[in-house]
């Protein structure tokens, strides 16, 4: 009787062990966005610059914008730089050996203050070339600043930045690409790819304990410039951002600088797409009370974050401050509950 019980118990234990091993080896039903840890300053603060639509071999005032970025970056002692995409014009990189990487990036952003990590998303022009070239770790071995992924998180403790690959959301690139060719090799099947992005983003935002949440994408959710609002992002992405109390959405794509804040959404919509060629003279916005700032020239943006305050400044090609916006949040220590 005793030996039968021992054999039976052993059988149950072995069965449970096999089940545990199979479960541990099985793929997770919910994947997670890759996360890069970026330590804040000793006081918990961070500061960074935001530039978009820039890679033109230094032309169209790219070099002048880079010079002023270096000056402002030194004054602020920035921690890193954010790129909102369209890193290499006109058609991305042809290969890992494309000289455009050096001519549009390494040889342009040479100021000492800009020798910090650059966190980059892809834009639609980047998708016109070899996407894997921009994503390759070989580029980082050539220039250690370059950190480019499709979608990922930068965790700076006080703030988390969620980088989203927005180009595959836009129907027109698939339905009517005209004479353009896009590299969708890492995107198909599209429906599954987009759902994965949305699921992982929603999970990351929901689980984030950061004081400030910022989302970065190439395409604008709201814009008064040539491309206007991106309807696919308004319907698919915006509800997730609003439900998870995102503070800022930062983008490029439209070659301008703008700040939109609507009564329908608590999110600040910030466009920094003036890294080189700008689009002068185009403006289409019907609710002037929502447009806090619009500039149809070249420039960039800075962000400074502390435990209780966030400050955004837009600069032109000469480094002049054009627009500033500040907000604040209560510190945890400010909440007092009497016994």
From Swiss-Prot:
Top EC category: hydrolase
Tissue specificity comment: Expressed in roots, stems, leaves, flowers and siliques.
Q: Check the UniProt entry and state the signal peptide residues, or none.
A: 1-31
Q: Which UniProt keywords apply?
A: Glycoprotein, Hydrolase, Iron, Metal-binding, Secreted, Signal, Zinc
Q: Required co-factor?
A: Fe cation; Zn(2+)
Chain sites annotated for binding Fe cation: 53, 86, 89, 255
The reaction(s) annotated as catalysed by this protein in its Swiss-Prot or TrEMBL entry are: a phosphate monoester + H2O = an alcohol + phosphate
User: Which sites bind Zn(2+)?
Assistant: 86, 124, 218, 253
Molecular function terms from GO = acid phosphatase activity; metal ion binding
Q: Which InterPro entries match?
A: Acid_PPase (IPR024927), Calcineurin-like_PHP_ApaH (IPR004843), Metallo-depent_PP-like (IPR029052), Metallophosphoesterase_PAP (IPR051558)
> Cofactor binding mode, per the note?
Binds 1 Fe cation per subunit.
Q: Which Pfam families match?
A: Metallophos (PF00149)
Subcellular locations according to the entry: Secreted
Task: Write out the catalytic residues in the record.
Answer: 227
EC numbers on record:
3.1.3.2
Residues noted as binding substrate in the record, renumbered to the chain: 253-255
What positions does the record give for glycosylation?
61, 284
Gene Ontology cellular-component terms for this entry are:
extracellular region
What subunit structure does UniProt give? Homodimer.
Q: Could you say which protein family the record assigns here?
A: Belongs to the metallophosphoesterase superfamily. Purple acid phosphatase family.
Name it.
Purple acid phosphatase 4
Q: What is the lineage of its organism?
A: Eukaryota, Viridiplantae, Streptophyta, Embryophyta, Tracheophyta
